[in-house]
Amino acid sequence: MFKLLGKPLIQHVIELLKEKGLENFVVVIGHGGEQIKEHFGDGSDLGVHIAYTIQKEALGMANALETAEALAEDHFFVVNADDLFEGSLIAEMAAKFKEGNADIVLSCKPVEETWKFGIITVKNGRVTNLVEKPLKGKETRNLAVIGVYLMSKRIFDYFRRVPVSDHQYEDAIQKFIEDKNNVSAVSYDGFFAGYKYPWDLFRMNTFLMDNTIKKPRIEDGVSISEKAKVEGNVWIRKGAKILDNACVNGPCYIGANTIIGNNCLVRGYASIGDNCIVGFTSEVKNSLIGDNCLFHMNYVGDSIISDGCLFGAGATTGNFRFDEKNIVLTIDGKKVDTGTNKLGAIVGDRSRAGINSSLAPGVRFGPYSIVGAGVNLQEDLEPGKMIFLDKKSNIVKDNGFTLSAEEKQKLTEVLKKYKQAK
């Protein structure tokens, strides 16, 4: 699980909900979910209770909720584990539920790209229609449903009444509306970000830093050289070391037992995990770095580097196109505009970039991939693959350079003077 400020995203969500008085959680897990279960256990470390259900196949949100039907109370919140928002939204939805005796409360906000969302119509305070991803040009409203719901247990009956599909969840809510049940909505204008693409993590990281690191936080056991410079709102965890001539310009986060080496620069919303070494003269700018990563004489800008990665000396991330246009990536065969002209590399777990390798803006590789020394990586590299330059034989020749006796004498005298000067 990738961490932001030392915690998995789902933990930030659980802690936010706990602050608003929610203590009982059901987490639906699927493939790879054991990692979540091992991390949280029964939730007692967080002061909550967590139960788990398993969704054996990825059959959509309605199916996921059906696995938890036996554990559901009469009314309950439904929250995506990878959505981040302000706690005020939960309070507003709870208040709406109490004041209007609603069966379901949806959260919504105005959007421009309406064809990407479920769009609702609201009349006299009640939701009268929900259309999932209306055709572009055919939409007549712009209020989009976002991923926080206050649901009635009666919704499970509606899941069973509509066919299984990608839109089963939304179709069931629409059926619930058509049957004249009371569905209300809260219009929300606060921060909201969903994790769909890797670069979505940058907005989340910025939000968390701005709201969590409001003043410098230097934990016990941190060693900061007198020759180092630490400025702004930084959070440095226990056991970390900031060596001579290093510069840390907040807002930044530096994990436990991480070393920021000599002459390094860490700046601009950089987040570095636990047990990392940012070696001599490296620069890390607005990047998200996992645990146990090693760097040496690197530039890492606007990049996402997962756990256990290693960058050899001189490996560099490019993060800006010469034409200054947005970075566009190919995702599942489709071109996707990232919405930013600053994006570096996206690197999966346990991957390596060899000495003097160059990583083009937005390039992706890993997990378990290797970019060889000197490679200029312009395209994505699949997981578990290696890429190297063609092996070319080195040419060995006589240098054809000889010194006369007089030249040798002059060189010897110069070397003697140099030695005496030292």
Question: What is each PLM-predicted segment?
Answer:
Residues 82-83, 228:
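Active-site metal-binding loops of divalent metal-dependent hydrolases
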Residues 163-166, 177-262:
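Extended, small-residue-rich solenoid/repeat segments and analogous flexible loops
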Residues 79, 85-87, 151, 311, ...:
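Hydrophobic/aromatic residue at the end of a short beta strand that borders the catalytic acidic motif
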Residues 279-422:
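Glycine-rich hexapeptide-repeat left-handed beta-helix
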